[in-house]
Amino acid sequence: MTKALVTAHLKAFPMEQRKILELLRGQIAAELPTAKQVIKYGIPTFVVDGKPIIGFSGYKKHNSIFPYSGTVASVLKSELRNYEQTKGSIHFAIDKPFPRVLLRKILKAKFELMQQP
């Protein structure tokens, strides 16, 4: 699964939603310049050293970020209080970008959790 498959996946979304998802993709790529972009579990995912770091996708009523760790959301509980969540996802509006500052915090928390034994 390659970067081209991620691009193809995103082309399936309506233009306005696709713009938001492409922006998120670019921000994640800037934060994780060595990551590979793949499709994992049917969603675009950034992988570092063979480990999924963060995924994202769009849906009919929301977009989602998948930190591949339910613990990330609990670590950032207060920062994520305004976002609907499931055990493995953080939902955000279809028409509004996900805050880059919060994206950085999610990535930082993910890497810190990965360092724990």
List PLM regions with ranges:
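Charge-dense, helix-prone N-terminal extensions
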Residues: M1-P117
